[in-house]
């Protein structure tokens, strides 16, 4: 009986989602270094190597699902990132925060140069998953893996 209650208690903990960096299906992007993504997210680099404007599309940066991505891409805790995003967006919208997975997918598909951070199980055929430092979301050592 004790084992069953321990199992039930353990299953109540929120699962860490596997997040993916996505781009529109027609994008030429394939593999993006984490260091380049971080420079783009922090505003140190404004455009992709081909000159297209960079836009990051994400859901609430303070949500538990986004914790690892915010840490890796912005180098700060979720509680501080909203003010950093507001500052980045003063001249041009660099980071778009959307309400749902569907909004994120639509925005990435419709915005040239956009990438999004999304739960791998929400991906559809309108987008493709980018490698980050040569790795996909389920590969060992993937940069945005929560555990």
Predicted regions and their residues:
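Bacterial N-terminal signal peptides
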Residues: 1-9
């Amino acid at each position: 009986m004790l084992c069953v209650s321990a199992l039930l208690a353990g299953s109540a903990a929120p699962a860490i989602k596997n997040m993916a960096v996505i781009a529109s299906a027609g994008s030429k992007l394939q593999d993006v270094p984490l260091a380049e993504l971080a420079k783009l997210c922090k505003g140190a680099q404004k455009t992709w190597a081909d000159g297209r404007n960079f836009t990051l599309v994400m859901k609430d940066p303070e949500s538990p699902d986004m914790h690892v991505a915010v840490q890796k891409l912005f180098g700060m805790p979720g509680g501080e990132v909203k003010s950093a995003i507001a500052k980045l967006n003063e001249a041009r919208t660099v980071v778009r925060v959307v309400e749902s997975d569907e909004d994120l997918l639509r925005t990435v598909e419709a915005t040239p140069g956009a990438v999004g951070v999304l739960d791998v199980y929400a991906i559809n055929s309108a987008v493709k998953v980018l490698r980050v430092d040569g790795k996909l979301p389920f590969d060992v050592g993937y940069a945005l893996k929560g555990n």
